[in-house]
A protein has these predicted regions:
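N-terminal maturation segment of proteins
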Residues: 1-385
Length: 385
């Protein structure tokens, strides 16, 4: 279909434009064919393989620690990251367990109980147009409610608005469940918080608020937009993508929402936040498990399914992602913990002089940065506070 459209446009184009379009199309198709052939040959040569990690590959012993350094911007070793992930899973699971028991769900693993709770009809939207409209209305209400509270947390706020949008139905099956899109650099296009509504059953009502705060405000939209709108910074600093900083901030934003009581009217909304945190902690365990500890795909999938409670199909997709993108999934929780640590350290040093709004402005005004640089920024801010 795409090829036909391009050919039709080429036919309508004149002269040089027609040649350029045909050449580009031909090169693209040829590249796809070459790639498919190489992948087929590689698969045939390797055969069925259950070893998912990179460590056992040539150069993998040196490569994975470099991946971890790049994705987390820390000097944490794979063994240290694995231990941290396990400790976080234990801590977060205990907190989630208490909330689940308060709902009368006492038997089974935490992940299994969260899955059962997420299937209860009282928490689900109808999987039809009316249900989707209700879900979008709830998301808009969540964004509006938290925006009214932002002045309590920040002195500088984004000028560019954020809109809640449904992922276009034509791409839902291959799209992420939820994601943020920044506005334009000149501020003429708003930012967007996209939600995948292919099946509303994946969105129990208690799981949505934390996603909203992660993707919109005070999460991705706020952080990325403030970087774009900052005065006196270079284009590089406005647009630099540092995984642990960006994703760590978004998890920290979920925590900020909790601190100002955004989950109070929906007590299980806090369970949604804990599930989000647990999910990211499990990612560290699974990623380092496969790429450093020699875990098989099956062991990684079983651990993730049992601990978080994701459906097996969703787990398999996640495992595929971690296999081809070593250490990327470790950046989320490691980044979050660093924001928490630096804030606690600043509070301890400044005491009554600590101002949360000024702290947030200090860590955000320079755009995304390596966590080691962030630590120096906070130290300088504390020194001058």
């Amino acid at each position: 279909m795409t090829a036909t459209v391009i050919e039709m446009r080429a036919i309508r184009a004149d002269g040089e434009w027609a040649d350029l379009i045909r050449d580009a199309w031909g090169q693209s198709v040829a590249g796809i064919i070459r790639t498919a052939k190489l992948l087929a040959e590689a698969k045939a040569a390797i055969g069925e393989c259950h070893e998912a990690g990179i460590r056992g590959r040539p150069g993998g012993e040196a490569y994975y620690p470099l991946c971890l350094r790049y994705q987390t911007s820390t000097r944490m070793t794979p063994d240290e990251a694995h231990a941290l992930g396990l400790a976080q899973v234990t801590e977060i699971s205990a907190e989630a367990d208490a909330l689940l028991k308060a709902q009368g769900l006492r038997e089974g693993a935490v992940g299994a109980r969260m899955t059962a709770l997420g299937k209860e009809p009282r928490w689900l939207y109808p999987n039809d147009d009316d249900g989707r409209a209700e879900l979008l209305a709830d998301l808009n209400a969540q964004v509006e409610a938290v925006q009214r509270r932002l002045p309590e947390l920040f002195r500088v706020l984004p000028r560019t608005p954020v809109e809640v949008r449904r992922v276009p139905p034509a791409i839902e099956l291959g799209a992420p469940r939820g994601y943020a899109q920044t506005g334009s650099l000149d501020g003429t296009r708003p930012g967007a918080y996209y939600i995948n509504l292919a099946d509303t059953a994946i969105w129990p009502k208690w799981a949505l608020p934390t996603l909203t705060y992660h993707e919109s405000v005070p999460g991705h939209h706020l952080q990325l937009t403030l970087a774009l709108e900052a005065e006196g910074t270079s284009l590089l600093h406005k647009t630099l993508l540092m995984n642990a900083f960006i994703e760590g901030w978004a998890l920290y934003a979920e925590q900020l929402a909790d601190e100002i009581g955004m989950y109070r009217d929906l007590p299980l909304g806090r369970l949604g936040m804990l599930q989000s945190f647990l999910y990211r902690a499990v990612r560290i365990v699974v990623d380092t498990g496969m790429h450093w500890k020699g875990w098989s795909r099956e062991k990684a999938a079983d651990y993730m399914e049992d601990t978080v409670g994701l459906a097996r199909g969703a787990v398999e997709n996640e495992i595929d992602r971690y296999c081809v993108w070593p250490a990327q999934a470790c950046g989320y929780k490691i980044g979050h913990l660093e924001f928490v640590r630096l804030r606690a350290e600043a509070e301890a040093k400044l005491g009554a002089r600590f101002d949360l709004r000024s702290f947030h402005d200090a860590v955000l005004k320079g755009g995304a940065m390596p966590l080691e640089v962030l630590a120096r920024v906070v130290a300088e801010w504390v020194k001058n506070a």
